[in-house]
């Protein structure tokens, strides 16, 4: 793989905010997630995808397995495959950075506020 500086970021609208993919290779993906106030992502798990994230701005309500806590900027966490999880921005916009394995298709939704099903 060669080094590049394209300046191209893929912005993907989501019902809860948006994602910006800044790196996509066969080994990893880098994203910025912006969750708007009062919104949350699906209660979900990944069969193969492994992700590490850090809160950049805002206060994130983080559910990992059966535990839920609120975390702020500078908090980093890792989500192993098969871990049930959810992110929520109850009091204001939240910005996260995520680096993961490349299986972006690997989403099993267990509950979704926006009516999305399955993958």
List the predicted regions and their residue ranges:
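Short hydrophobic/aromatic-rich beta-strand segments that constitute the beta-sheet cores
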Residues: 30, 42, 62-64, 98
